[in-house]
Design a protein with these regions (language model features):
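Mature extracytoplasmic enzyme cores
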Residues: 1-35, 60-66, 83, 125-127, ...
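Aromatic-lined ligand-binding clefts that engage carbohydrates, nucleic acids, or primary amines
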Residues: 17, 67, 71-92, 122-125, ...
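Short beta-strands within extracellular/lumenal beta-sheet-rich domains
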Residues: 57-69, 192-204
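Short strand-edge motifs at loop-to-beta-strand transitions and within beta-strands
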Residues: 63-65, 105-109, 243
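Exposed aromatic-hydrophobic patches
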Residues: 108-112, 244-251
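A glycine-anchored, Pro-Gly-centered beta-turn/N-cap motif
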Residues: 116-118, 255-257
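Short beta-strand-plus-loop segments that form exposed binding edges in beta-rich domains
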Residues: 124-130, 263-268
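Conserved small/polar residues in nucleotide/adenosyl-binding loops
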Residues: 285-289
Length: 289
């Protein structure tokens, strides 16, 4: 690229002399790709029966997931996103989750009131049914300090078959690794309208010989967040102005990282306070219903 500038010339004939500087414009390969709500989840087999014996009529297949919420900040919200192909019930920390899980659709289950700091144990219970059935799930934990952690179904969700619900006072078969199956053909079409996600891949040498790189983002939605791993790196409330993000101004380095961009609607009772204008008037934005 070529840029022009003017230099003051002194002497007998003072004036401004035009100069030019030539520089190479770096080619940035920062890729952004949409991310499905259950894209990273493995699909686990809940049934594969061509006939159920009479003694198995009351049997259920259980899936167990132990997880630790050890972030020092208080828990703000815990949400389970689950797509099962058959009915199931949920239990978290020895308490049955009083929310219906509907088959053949994406369920959003609020687990906030059941979760606790430290070790948690979640299990899902599926009755034996004929045919092949499967499910996928994802848990997102939000903290008041704006950190976020999540996990999805994988081979760590141990499973066992039994005729009664597990409890501390009852012996039941030792859980084993689940059967991981191929994603169904409709998996890519599973969508969630409250928020959408994208992956942002930053090259490892993106900032080499540069002071900064700016991403300029225009989006449709009420709020946007960028996560670097589990930590909130930047956010923006949509005021219909271009959101400018300086990659070298983030608290933690983003070079060589995969960032997550989240854009979502606000709750109906959410309030946004913008910067105080010059005349001292207070601006308050309430999300439309």
């Amino acid at each position: 690229k070529k840029a022009a500038y003017y230099k003051l010339k002194t002497g007998m004939n003072p004036g401004f002399e035009q100069k030019a500087v030539i520089f190479n414009q770096p080619q940035m390969d920062i890729r952004i790709q949409p991310k499905g709500i259950l894209e990273e989840a493995k699909w686990l087999e809940t049934a594969n029966f061509h006939g159920i014996e009479p003694y198995q009529q009351r049997y259920r297949r259980f899936f167990f997931k132990e997880f630790n919420l050890d972030n020092p900040s208080e828990i703000k919200k815990v949400t389970l996103f689950m797509y099962p192909e058959s009915k199931c019930i949920l239990n978290l920390n020895d308490t049955w989750v009083n929310q219906e899980v509907k088959p053949n659709q994406l369920n959003e289950i609020d687990l906030t009131g059941y979760a606790r700091k430290g070790v948690n144990l979640l299990f899902a219970s599926f009755p034996f049914v004929e045919g092949k059935k499967q499910f996928a799930a994802r848990v997102i934990v939000e903290y008041y300090k704006y950190d976020r952690t999540e996990f999805s179904t994988d081979s760590s969700w141990l499973t066992t078959d039994y005729y009664s619900n597990p409890s501390l006072t009852r012996v039941f078969p030792q859980p084993v690794a689940p059967v991981v199956v191929d994603k169904p053909g409709y998996a890519e079409s599973i969508a969630y309208n409250t928020f959408k996600e994208w992956r942002i891949q930053v090259p490892i040498d993106a900032l080499e010989n540069l002071n900064n790189i700016y991403m300029r983002i225009n989006y449709s939605g009420d709020k946007a967040e960028i996560y670097n791993g589990y930590m909130l790196s930047d956010d923006d409330y949509n005021s219909h102005a271009t959101w400018t993000v300086g990659l070298n101004r983030q608290e933690h380095s983003v070079e060589g990282k995969e960032l997550t961009l989240v854009i979502y609607k606000l709750d109906k009772d959410e309030k946004i306070f913008f910067d105080l204008p010059a005349n001292g008037t207070c601006l308050l934005y309430t999300s439309p219903s």
